[in-house]
Swiss-Prot record:
Keywords: Cytoplasm, Histidine metabolism, Lyase. It is found in: Cytoplasm. This is Histidine ammonia-lyase. HAMAP family: His_ammonia_lyase. One of its GO terms (biological process) is L-histidine catabolic process to glutamate and formate. The keyword ATP-binding does not apply. There is a cross-link at residues 141-143 (5-imidazolinone (Ala-Gly)). The gene is hutH. It is an enzyme of class 4 (lyase). Gene3D superfamilies: Fumarase/aspartase (Central domain), Fumarase/aspartase (N-terminal domain). Pathway: Amino-acid degradation; L-histidine degradation into L-glutamate; N-formimidoyl-L-glutamate from L-histidine: step 1/3. GO terms for cellular component: cytoplasm. One of its GO terms (molecular function) is histidine ammonia-lyase activity. InterPro entries: Aromatic_Lyase, Fumarase/histidase_N, HutH, L-Aspartase-like, Phe/His_NH3-lyase_AS.
Amino acid sequence: MVVLTGHTLTLEEVKRVLYRDELVIASKESMEAVERSRKAVEEIVANKNVVYGINTGFGKFSDVLIAAGDVEELQWNLIHSHACGVGEPFPEEVSRAMLLLRANALLKGYSGVRPIVIERLLDLLNAKIHPVIPQQGSLGASGDLAPLSHLALALLGEGEVFYRGKRVPAIEALSAEGIAPITLKAKEGLALINGTQAMTAMGVVVYLEAEQLAYESEAIAAMTIEGLRGIIDAFDEHVHLVRGYRQQVEVAARIRDYLAGSKLTTRQGELRVQDAYSLRCIPQVHGASWQVLDYVKEKLEIEINAATDNPLIFEGGAKVISGGNFHGQPIAFAMDFMKIAIAELANISERRIERLVNPQLNDLPPFLSPAPGLQSGAMIMQYTAASLVSENKTFAHPASVDSIPSSANQEDHVSMGTIASRHAYAILQNTRRVLAIELICAMQAVEYRGVENMAPKTRKLYEAVRNIVPSITKDRIFSKDIEATAQWLKGVDWPFFLQTITPTNQYS
């Protein structure tokens, strides 16, 4: 069970909720803070104090005073008018993360919602009712207005949701679970949609999956080293300690661990003096990507516990301040940085694929073909990898350097953070497929070398994937193999699978 406080949520807890469907509840203390904040809003309405978003219009309409009798209609209008998202929906795990993160943000007690609003968010989460939320339409300031409006619709029993494997009207799923829709009161519509939870939710999913893929990329690279009879000396601890980057040292340690006991690796001067960079510099390149992952993790763990609403209510209502915590610039920067880190794992992987299939660079059959000439073998797999890598370079263009004014220039600088997160997710999918191709090629290469000569850990990886992708004995439709391998990489419980050495403070 994960207990939300608004302050202590971790990425490990988010992972358990997203991928293991762990039950989520709100702490008693946080709900008490929510109640105090709500009383402040009700007093503002009763006393007819003018406060943005409670009894005024929104954006450029912030100077329009709303009559007391129209305050609830204001919130209803807000959600419906702002539900302007278009395009394909976010993956279900992202929608699920948005429910979790919005509930956690509201539990900080600075937003002025009733406890029932948070309870409904958690009801949907625990019942696995995931709002259908279009991916396109957010500028990343004033928060993720359009995506979160589609989330809010589900609380009202409107819009569509994913439920039990189907896309159905929200009211149908709520009725099936005995969950009553809510009616929004003063400020609650704004509190639901004024935040960074779309970009952050997708960012969290990208981080969690990229972390696993980074580990996997090292084991795949280790098998490639075996397939190419690579030189193990380049991974000696002394080399990496003198540079001083913890992540680089740890990657080298994991490569040594994966290759322990291998009869396929070589020593300096045995076959050649040194390897190409795509083999020799694995710790330096992969380690640099880990540095970015660590940076992104730090930013995400702040943002998943952040108050990103506007206005914010302090000191029991004594202070109600309009600020800009909804601005997604920190996450936009983090996701743009993440795009580069993930893309680079694909870049170096594609170069290793080339070394596996190019007969001018190895002593293996051309393109790993069982009958070169008659059969093309892995030739076009390298084309696919090159295409995916090239597409990644387009996606890696920073979204955060762009800004288009909106709301009649009231919102004159925006983050485009959700675009950055979406592109990071696209790069992640491409990179996983590139690594799947490398794994397929590496498995074929070690077969030519003799599987019995592999290290125990790389052989375990080989045997697991051979259960879903057979050896290349003749040409076939390799697209299915690539997708099956990519799905396996996404779904396997990696640290336990190969007892991967995880980061420590040994080299801090």
